[in-house]
């Protein structure tokens, strides 16, 4: 007999072991971003959000991608189950709205809330671009303002943005104070990520010139969808280590049938009650996921002065 996550969190509350940030620590607002699709962005976003919730943090996952893969993994059929009013869309287009509270919904993971997306959110790309062309550049701060309106309730906000450099992605960059970039070790993905970084630098310079400074507490790269049986991937992994240095998460997120099988069930590996392949494959997959997510967790905690002494005691500072 085991305990539910809600019961574990109750016990953490009784024993004073909740890992929450202090009230004067900044909320970690983390974007999992790459301008190329198919790199494992949504998979990493959802598994990271659930991992943090399992650890006892208060987490908000914001699905900013109109493809709504993250929302789908929480059991929604986005264009049937969700209206445009359930997403970011009203907040991005209606200046009179001052809070994102209306769009937040609890999930079956205790401590993890979701702002979902559906295809209708894509319409806001055109509307934001048109308004910005008329000189309303401050619209890029709308998402930042919305997150600020609810951030007091959370330790971490994880954002899953669209895989494109549009108005929503720029808004995510403005809102985020940390960035995680998933990079599969293939020639196409590696080269497109290099282009993404160059474009990111150029975009941030333009924003700075317009008085919109964007500061990141950390930038990490995750080798995603890794198949080390392929010699070219092994070579590219070595190259990534040389180029990204300590910014590269040490644990690669290897390709696994457990992730694929969980996704086919509209679930994550953390939700599966048992292996869908074999026990050893499941354990290896969880080792990769926990390894990636635990490194990012340390980066998040390093943002919080209240965790300094604990990180030193744990040998993580």
Regions from the PLM with identified roles:
Residues 2-317:
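P-loop NTP-binding core
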């Amino acid at each position: 007999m085991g305990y539910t996550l809600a019961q574990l969190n109750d016990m953490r509350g009784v024993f004073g072991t909740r890992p929450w940030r202090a009230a004067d620590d900044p909320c970690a607002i983390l974007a999992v971003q790459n301008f190329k699709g198919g790199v494992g962005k949504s998979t990493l976003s959802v598994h990271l959000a659930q991992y943090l919730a399992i650890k006892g943090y208060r987490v908000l996952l914001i699905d900013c991608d109109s493809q709504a893969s993250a929302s789908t993994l929480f059991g929604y059929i986005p264009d049937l189950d969700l209206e445009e009013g359930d997403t970011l869309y009203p907040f991005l287009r209606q200046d009179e709205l001052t809070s994102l509270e209306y769009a937040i919904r609890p999930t079956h993971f205790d401590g993890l809330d979701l702002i979902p997306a559906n295809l209708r959110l894509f319409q806001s790309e055109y509307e934001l671009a048109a308004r910005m062309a008329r000189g309303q550049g401050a619209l890029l701060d709308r998402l930042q303002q919305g997150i600020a309106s609810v951030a007091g309730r959370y330790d971490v906000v994880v954002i899953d943005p669209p895989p494109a450099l549009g108005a929503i992605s720029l808004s995510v960059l403005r809102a985020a104070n940390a960035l995680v970039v998933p990079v599969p070790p293939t020639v196409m993905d590696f080269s497109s990520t290099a282009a993404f970084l160059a474009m990111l630098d150029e975009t941030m310079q333009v924003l700075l010139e317009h008085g919109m400074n964007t500061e990141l507490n950390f930038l990490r790269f995750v080798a995603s969808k890794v198949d080390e049986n392929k010699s070219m991937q092994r070579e590219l992994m070595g190259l990534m280590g040389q180029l990204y240095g300590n910014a590269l998460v040490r644990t690669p997120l290897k390709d696994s049938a457990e992730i694929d099988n969980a996704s086919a069930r509209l679930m994550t590996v953390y939700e599966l009650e048992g292996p869908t392949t074999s026990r050893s494959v499941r354990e290896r997959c969880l080792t990769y996921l926990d390894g990636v997510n635990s490194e990012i967790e340390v980066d998040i905690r390093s943002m919080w002065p209240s965790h300094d002494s604990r990180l030193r005691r744990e040998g993580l500072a």
